[in-house]
Design a protein with these regions (language model features):
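N-terminal "arm"/small-domain region of PLP-dependent enzymes with the aminotransferase-like
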Residues: 1-46, 176
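Conserved PLP-binding catalytic core of the aspartate aminotransferase-like
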Residues: 27, 270-277, 284-319, 334, ...
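PLP-dependent enzyme catalytic core of the Aspartate aminotransferase-like
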Residues: 31, 35-39, 43, 66, ...
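Conserved N-terminal alpha-helix of the aminotransferase class I/II PLP-enzyme fold
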Residues: 35, 39-82
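Conserved PLP-anchoring active-site segment centered on the Schiff-base-forming lysine
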Residues: 90-109
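Active-site phosphate-binding strand-loop segment of PLP-dependent enzymes
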Residues: 123, 127-180
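Active-site PLP attachment segment
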Residues: 198-233
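Structural motif of enzymes handling amino- and sulfur-group chemistry
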Residues: 245-265, 271, 275, 284
Length: 360
């Protein structure tokens, strides 16, 4: 890749239509984000070179947290150097409130790594299976223990959404907690872009949200949002927050601008949803199995790794980049994966579908 990711991206020296990655709103190359980053670079240098527990705070990092509070309608937020740390910071912040951890078997690496670092029993349940979660709670949880469920909000390979309302029904009798790493849901799902919880319209004191600014928002770094007590816990007890260097200040400045833009322009989500509907309808006509949700991810397997690699090469030669990957939740032969952006035009989408019809 030799340009910012967007609907048209330079790859291998050629401008191609880009239907991969996670720049759902094309903000990574947005002029306002770049200007904000350059201005911060000139004033603050590369980064604070120390933890936020020391002298690492600066007005830019605090502005990101203010923007997060406004975007998610929460009373406080904690922002740190990597989205990979989000689940860990959340789990460490809540550590005194649960006794055992239950993890979706297809959870992202960062969730699994976090769960196994906590020093508490960890149990895996079948992918997106509330019934199996119930059985695991019944057989593994000891009397008077509180469970903590850790899962993706939107799973990265296929874009499937975790059945949060079902999980809430199952875990509430145990007074359990849910920690949702909504990396692919925030900014995208829900009327205000607040993610999977808002998509389902669920709310509970036991629901907790972690996410990243590296996808929809065009920036970088992880975050958790919630009440004052939760965030105070992150700042005083979460080693992953206390002991890490914050996001480089220029990138944080760009992230703050990205949050502001996405909050101020809900029509960007409207365009994304229209494009998602257009792509999914077209792929369905080609016989591709479709999960009919607003998630801008479609992945499928033809059953043959060689065939899928060939399809990817054919499209690349025709000036269109889609992904072939072996990732979490994918079968052994891998999948073809298409990602949709709000910045794709009808012409871009028509060309993608036309070339796929020939290649498949």
């Amino acid at each position: 890749m030799e340009s910012a990711p967007g609907a048209e991206t330079i790859i291998g020296g050629k401008r191609r239509l880009y239907f991969a990655g996670t720049s759902y709103f094309g903000l990574h190359g947005h002029a306002d984000l770049i200007r904000a980053g350059v201005k911060a670079f000139q004033k603050y240098g590369t980064h604070s070179a120390t933890s936020r527990a020391g002298f690492g705070n600066n007005p830019v990092l605090l502005e990101v947290e203010e923007q997060l509070k406004e975007f998610f309608g929460e009373t406080d937020a904690a922002y740190f150097g990597s989205g990979y740390l989000s689940s860990l910071v959340l789990a460490q912040s809540l550590a005194e409130k649960y006794d055992a951890v239950f993890v979706d078997e297809a959870a992202h690496f960062c969730i699994a790594d976090s769960a196994h670092s906590l020093g508490k029993p960890v149990y895996r349940f079948r992918h997106r299976d509330a019934g199996d979660l119930r059985r695991k709670l019944q057989t593994k949880l000891k009397p008077r223990q509180t469970p903590f469920l850790m899962t993706d909000g939107v799973f990265p390979t296929y874009g499937y959404i975790a059945p949060v309302p079902d999980y809430l029904d199952v875990i509430t009798p145990y007074k359990g907690l849910i920690g949702l790493d909504d990396a692919h849901g925030v900014g995208v799902l829900g009327p205000n872009g607040r993610g999977t919880y808002e998509h389902f319209g669920v709310a509970s004191e036991g629901l907790h949200l972690a996410g990243t600014l590296s996808k929809a928002f065009g920036g970088h770094g992880g975050f958790i949002v919630g009440g004052k007590k939760l965030i105070a816990g992150a700042r005083t007890t979460a080693g992953a927050y206390i002991g890490s260097t914050p996001t480089p200040t220029p990138i944080a400045a760009a992230a703050a601008k990205g949050i502001e833009i996405l909050r101020s322009h809900p029509e960007m989500r409207d365009r994304l949803r229209k494009n998602v509907s257009l792509v999914k309808a077209g792929l369905k006509k080609l016989g591709v199995p479709i999960d009919d949700t607003p998630v801008p991810i479609v992945a499928w397997s033809t059953g043959s790794a060689e065939k899928m690699k060939k399809v990817q090469r054919l499209l690349m030669n025709r000036g269109i980049a889609i992904a072939y990957l072996k990732y979490i939740g994918a079968p052994s032969e891998g999948v073809l994966r298409v990602t949709v952006f709000s910045t794709h035009t009808v012409e871009h989408i028509s060309r993608l579908l036309k070339e796929l019809a020939t290649a498949l």
